[in-house]
Amino acid sequence: MTLEFPDDLKYSDSHEYVRMDGEIATVGISAYAIDQLGDIVFIELPEVGDSIEKEEPFGTIESVKAVEDLKAPVTGTVIERNEDILDEHEKLSEDPYIEGWLLKVRVKDPDELNGDDIYSADDYRKLVEGE
């Protein structure tokens, strides 16, 4: 997989990404995180209507290498989850930014994306190249 980091996204240091469209955030996992995890075998996501809190776990992802918490890059209410990836884990590695998104969240405070713990594509690339 080519490690791409689209410029229209924001990234967290726990390797989740956010694509904003008005007050709706599409949340997923970066190509870097998926590459590090290897083959995904299980994903647990919150239900529609659940609240998620920035920097708090909202689900888990299990691979052949590890089990990791998914941490919320924003605070808000889940309005949609990508049911397809629960059964078709390969969508995460094939297309993490379009087909492999995890959640759509109605964001409580969009200014959360302006903090020091949220990165542009260029800054995120520098972060992961240093790991």
From Swiss-Prot:
Keywords: Lipoyl. GO terms for biological process: glycine decarboxylation via glycine cleavage system. Its cofactor is (R)-lipoate. GO terms for cellular component: cytosol; glycine cleavage complex. The modification N6-lipoyllysine is found at residue 65. The glycine cleavage system is composed of four proteins: P, T, L and H. Belongs to the GcvH family. This is Glycine cleavage system H protein. It comes from Trichodesmium erythraeum (strain IMS101).
